[in-house]
Amino acid sequence: MRIGLFTDTYFPQVSGVATSIRTLKEELEKQGHEVYVFTTTDKKVKRYEDPTIIRLPSVPFISFTDRRVVYRGLISSYKIAKQYKLELIHTQTEFSVGLLGKMVAAALRIPVVHTYHTQYEDYVEYIANGKLIKPSMVKYIVRGFLNDLDGVICPSRIVLNLLDDYHIKIPKRVIPTGIKLEDYLRDDISQKDIDSLRVDLGVANDETMLLSLSRISSEKNIQAVLSHFPEVLTENPKVKLVVVGDGPYSDDLKVLAKELDIESKVVFTGMVNHEDVAVYYRAADFFISASTSETQGLTYTESLASGTPVIAHGNPYLDDLIDDKMFGTLFYREEDLADAILDAIAETPVMDAKKHQEKLYTISAEHFGKSVYAFYLDVLISEKSKKKEKFSLTVKGSKTDRSIKLAKTAISLPSQAVKATAMTSVKVVKAPKHLIEIVRDFLD
């Protein structure tokens, strides 16, 4: 199959969405499919470095300058998609490149599926201080984008429930993003490497190491872990929290740790190299997160792949993932966080090898790729079925034949409408030069 992935974010940008798309591309290619990524330009890579990655002219997005939006390229995208003979388009964003993907699919008359990655209610406050888009507007924007598509992939039951609440009627399927197991099941990581890292972090052999690994922003809710950490230390002083990552909330967390007088028990490492992340997971006794904004969260599966159980704020996605005490401990109220940590330390059993192996396949990139392709096939079969119904033969003079003639009459454009369209075209031609150039640039 020839597939086009349309996304605003892609490697080398760092995000869960970019990682998910790259993983999907690689897994589909392993199955023998042709996959082309239509995305934004990036200063860190050459525009024409890879013929399977089509980078469209873009500018930084307001309020999120590390993210970009396209401002031109519709016609060129259409020509490339037509040349590559795409059979299906898979959009990964509801904005610039996603809208472009819908237009290209409509022009080529091929199906479009979408993955809904982000709960925008948690992020609209960052766009023009929340003055441009209100949380109550999100469902209408999402509904407008999705309702004429052929299917939507939900990374978790959280997203499925959300889209049901939005009254999205198109076919939906829950397919969590998989991870590359080989990145975490590494034979080159020795016990000596693990012990050495714990020493470097100041974690003693008899101490429990809790690992927080993410972009450090307020919605990750690391502040909740810090706020309840004194309660944990009162009951069990041999616990240390290691915070890996960087972001806009980093300094605030360091100030909070100082105010709570827990500086000696909290280690801030900043960003670490991607190849070292697996060592941190293996060195930790537990991975911890109090975030309530994740639709899935790849760090949970990365931790489980490394054999490290999770302590996290429960949600439908984690209810499915953490289905055995050996995989982790969930809490559902922030005030229960400290008790959850203490319970996990005291009660978590050793991972059963067979159950862990079964879990590894369900969270693997291979399983993810096969599940997405199966959804593509269902969409294509459904699309062919619709076309057969639409173009089925009818008996001349029958009710069906008369209905078709009536439909043809109804969709014939009246001459008055043609005249009105012509007048509109004249007005467009007379539009200001800079406006015409903007339209032309986007189309080219």
What spans do the regions from the language model cover?
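Short hydrophobic beta-strand element within catalytic cores of glycosyltransferases
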Residues: 309-312
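Conserved donor-binding/catalytic core segment of Leloir-type glycosyltransferases
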Residues: 204-220, 226-229
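Aromatic "clamp/platform" in nucleotide-sugar-dependent glycosyltransferases that forms part
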Residues: 292
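Short alpha-helical donor nucleotide-sugar binding micro-motif in glycosyltransferases
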Residues: 81, 269-272, 279-284
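A charged, aromatic-enriched C-terminal amphipathic alpha-helix characteristic of glycosyltransferases
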Residues: 31, 349-402
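N-terminal subdomain of nucleotide-sugar transferases
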Residues: 1-45, 49-55, 373, 397, ...
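Donor nucleotide-sugar binding/catalytic pocket of nucleotide-sugar-dependent glycosyltransferases
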Residues: 39, 54-57, 135, 140-193
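Conserved acidic donor-binding segment of nucleotide-sugar-dependent glycosyltransferases
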Residues: 324-335, 343-349
